[in-house]
């Protein structure tokens, strides 16, 4: 019987291992990937040597370092947001920043520590205390404060904490603005109250404005608090006083009581207003602004009431003398008869 045949196969070394995508990650090149991570989100950072763990923990104190596999594979788990109100609230564009030696930067530099802002920090009311104080100071940004006040009327946060912060803000604004509504933050508050256009907002506007001092009313609210002579004159016309009284047509609408504001809306008044926050021009640039009026008429304070205009024209027209016209007519007729 035949015996079995054995064949010796050639020996080969196993192929080298192929690194996975996770193994190719480098934590030192992932600053912009790690920073935006949400709460309880994992960010894989690849293999991490033991001697680098403390350095990574110091750079990212808001995260917990987690082992994910052999060979030192690791990940960072976000646990908190350490950004401060002054650094996060006084802008609407910042999600995080890097802090080093007491200075902050939007870009990472060696030795800097990450501090992140809470998501939707303005919507949750976490900025109200800081911005309320900052917007009354000397270094505030009017656009930021105006935007913050406006956003308060449209917050989506409906938690107990968020609602209580909003109530506290309204109460503080009402107290502050009742003393002096000319403060920039108060003028913004009145503007957004008017735009909110509810019965409660209208009542708050009128309450705040009625609390103003006599000097304030004399300076800013002469439309809402007219003189006796102006009131008596207004009885002569069917048109609302707000339509022809220059104190109304030229008034700051934020300082009008609701009834005056509504009456002004019934008028047909041409108004021109231009606001430029930032304008950059060079030698080739040109700028032209026009309201469709001549220079002499652009800032006219003549009342716009039509009846008054007609009366004004009649009063200043020449006086017709009928008896002189009659005599002149007879003289012309006599001359014609004699000439014939």
UniProtKB/Swiss-Prot annotation:
Effect noted on mutating residue 2 to A: Complete loss of myristoylation
This protein's record includes keyword Membrane: yes
Cited InterPro entries: Pox_virus_G9/A16
Pfam families: Pox_G9-A16
Membrane topology: Single-pass type II membrane protein
Compartments in which it is found: Virion membrane
Function of the molecule: Component of the entry fusion complex (EFC), which consists of 11 proteins. During cell infection, this complex mediates entry of the virion core into the host cytoplasm by a two-step mechanism consisting of lipid mixing of the viral and cellular membranes and subsequent pore formation.
Name of the featured protein: Entry-fusion complex protein OPG094
Source taxonomy: Viruses, Varidnaviria, Bamfordvirae, Nucleocytoviricota, Pokkesviricetes
Gene symbol of the encoding locus: OPG094
């Amino acid at each position: 019987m035949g015996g079995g045949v054995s064949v010796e196969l050639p020996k080969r070394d196993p192929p080298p291992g192929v690194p996975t995508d996770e193994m190719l990650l480098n934590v030192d090149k992932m600053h912009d990937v790690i920073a935006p991570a949400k709460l309880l989100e994992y960010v894989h950072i690849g293999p991490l040597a033991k001697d680098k763990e403390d350095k990574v923990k110091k750079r990212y104190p808001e995260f917990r370092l987690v082992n994910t596999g052999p060979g030192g594979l690791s990940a960072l788990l976000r646990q908190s947001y350490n950004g401060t109100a002054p650094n996060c609230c006084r802008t609407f564009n910042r999600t995080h920043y890097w802090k080093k030696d007491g200075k902050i930067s939007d870009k990472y530099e060696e030795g800097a520590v990450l501090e992140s802002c809470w998501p939707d920090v303005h919507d949750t009311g976490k900025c109200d205390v800081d911005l309320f104080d900052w917007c009354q100071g000397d270094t505030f940004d009017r656009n930021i404060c105006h935007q913050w006040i406006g956003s308060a009327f449209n917050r989506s946060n409906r938690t107990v904490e968020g609602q209580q912060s909003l109530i506290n803000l309204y109460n503080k604004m009402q107290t502050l603005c009742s003393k002096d509504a000319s403060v920039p933050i108060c003028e913004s508050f009145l503007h957004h109250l008017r735009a909110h256009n509810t019965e409660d907002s209208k009542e708050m506007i009128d309450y705040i404005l009625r609390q103003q001092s006599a000097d304030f009313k004399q300076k800013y609210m002469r439309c809402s608090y007219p003189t006796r002579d102006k009131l008596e004159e207004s009885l002569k016309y069917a048109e609302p006083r707000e339509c022809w009284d220059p104190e109304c047509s030229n008034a700051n609408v934020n300082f009008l009581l609701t009834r005056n504001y509504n009456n002004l809306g019934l008028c047909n008044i041409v108004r021109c207003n231009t606001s430029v926050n930032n304008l950059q021009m060079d030698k080739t640039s040109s700028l032209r602004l026009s309201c469709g009026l001549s220079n002499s008429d652009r800032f006219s304070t003549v009342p716009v009431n039509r009846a008054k205009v007609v009366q004004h024209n009649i009063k200043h027209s020449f006086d017709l003398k009928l008896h002189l016209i009659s005599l002149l007519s007879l003289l012309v007729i006599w001359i014609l008869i004699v000439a014939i």
